[in-house]
């Protein structure tokens, strides 16, 4: 019995002197992903998890800290280290929610100033809305719009007349990804009264630019031709792209088609010469290889191709549609400066626009609909789409 008691005492001592401090320091290290750009060696998806679910992960340092308090008498030094690390981890894990609350207070006024006021009743961000929300799936049809290319069509769930249509262009570095990427947003948009077309396009390296532009233009032409049977308004289209899809969205959406009422680009590059200049072979994506595959070589050898793929070079006063840009400040895969430079060019040309920059966020910031990034993104989309697709009076 005495031996067992001694073993138990040593186990408890190890818990308070080694295990709890280790857990606390690990939690602190993970929490820092809400404040610093993820090193290339760290999977960026981990940063998405920590940033958008920090309010849940905060239970870990909270539990560890409370447990450590009970052992202060036996291991005061280790307990203080544990408590300090837990306190810092809590701050960083809850930082996204605090920053989202502050941004949410300002966002409605910023959206109204950029695109005009619209009746949006729900708050941009609410702590009560944090949680796991999976949009209920609605009907979806698959159609071939060109040989070998299909789109998924989500009919608008409400509304009496032809619906405005959001054309969703997937990301994936131009050489991967598909139209089924993050479908929850498509179902949510359909429930808001918009038709949604999630389109496929040919991928590099087998199909370099401008194949992707041709495919999206073909999809737009098909949607317009079949607007009557689909129940959409061919004169009210919005392009929405993520990452590489955002690059395609601006490069196509800025060609001057009056039916394109707006463009939404999430964490995307828009000036391919600039993208080449800041890329390295050892970055998280091996961006130089991706761009060689996509654009056929370096900019000095493919000047016209680089220019036609750069929405920033296509901005024109009076014809470029209103644009919503959303980007995470600490995005490792696509530098936030891409969106900042695009916003500056749009401002210079007098194009209505807004850059929503999320300080804690990285790539795929809207993947968790109930998280800080998801709430702010859907609010911004709700306002933007209502403003730019309003029927002409």
Summary of predicted features, one role per range:
Residues 13-24, 33, 39, 51, ...:
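C-terminal catalytic histidine-bearing segment of alpha/beta-hydrolase fold enzymes
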Residues 38, 45-64, 115-160:
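N-terminal cap/lid segment of alpha/beta-hydrolase-fold proteins
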Residues 68, 218-280:
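Primarily recognizes the serine-hydrolase "nucleophile elbow" in alpha/beta-hydrolase
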Residues 109-125, 250-304:
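Hydrolase active-site cap/lid region
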Residues 162-172:
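Short beta-strand element of the alpha/beta-hydrolase
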Residues 177-186, 197-236, 255, 368-377:
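Catalytic nucleophile-loop/oxyanion-hole region of alpha/beta-hydrolase
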Residues 272, 330-334:
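Acidic catalytic loop of the alpha/beta-hydrolase fold
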Residues 318-319, 325-327, 331:
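Short beta-strand/loop motif that positions the catalytic acidic residue
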């Amino acid at each position: 019995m005495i031996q067992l008691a001694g073993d138990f005492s040593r186990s408890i001592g190890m818990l308070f002197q080694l295990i709890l401090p280790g857990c606390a320091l690990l939690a602190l290290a993970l929490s820092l992903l809400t404040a610093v750009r993820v090193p290339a060696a760290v999977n960026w998806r981990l940063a998405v998890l920590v940033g958008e679910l920090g309010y849940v992960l905060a239970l870990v340092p909270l539990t560890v800290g409370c447990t450590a308090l009970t052992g202060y008498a036996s291991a005061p030094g280790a307990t203080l280290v544990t408590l300090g690390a837990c306190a810092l981890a809590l701050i960083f894990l809850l930082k996204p929610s605090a920053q989202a609350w502050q941004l949410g207070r300002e966002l409605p006024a910023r959206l109204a100033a950029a695109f005009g006021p619209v009746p949006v009743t729900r708050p941009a961000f609410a702590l009560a809305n944090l949680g796991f929300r999976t949009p209920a799936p609605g009907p979806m049809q698959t159609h071939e719009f060109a040989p070998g290319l299909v789109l998924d069509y989500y009919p608008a769930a409400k509304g009496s007349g032809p619906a405005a249509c959001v054309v969703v262009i997937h990301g994936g570095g131009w050489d991967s990804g598909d139209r089924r990427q993050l479908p929850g947003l498509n179902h949510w948009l359909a429930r808001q009264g918009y038709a949604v077309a999630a389109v496929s396009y040919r991928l590099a390296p087998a199909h370099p630019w401008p194949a992707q532009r041709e495919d999206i233009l073909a999809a737009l032409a098909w949607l317009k031709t079949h607007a009557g049977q689909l129940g959409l308004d061919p004169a009210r289209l919005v392009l929405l792209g993520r990452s590489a899809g955002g690059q395609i969205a601006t490069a196509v959406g800025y060609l001057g088609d009056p039916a394109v009422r707006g463009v939404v680009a999430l964490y995307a590059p828009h000036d391919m010469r600039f993208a080449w200049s800041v890329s390295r072979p050892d970055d998280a994506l091996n961006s130089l290889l991706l761009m060689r595959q996509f654009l056929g070589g370096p900019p000095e050898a493919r000047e016209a191709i680089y220019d036609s793929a750069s929405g920033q070079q296509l901005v024109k006063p009076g014809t470029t549609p209103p644009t919503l840009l959303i980007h995470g400040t600490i995005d490792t895969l696509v530098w936030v400066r891409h969106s900042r430079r695009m916003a500056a060019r749009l401002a210079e040309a007098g194009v209505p626009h807004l850059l929503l920059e999320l300080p804690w966020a990285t790539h795929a910031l809207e993947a968790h609909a109930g998280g800080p990034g998801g709430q702010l993104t859907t609010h911004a989309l709700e306002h933007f789409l209502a403003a730019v697709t309003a029927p002409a009076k």
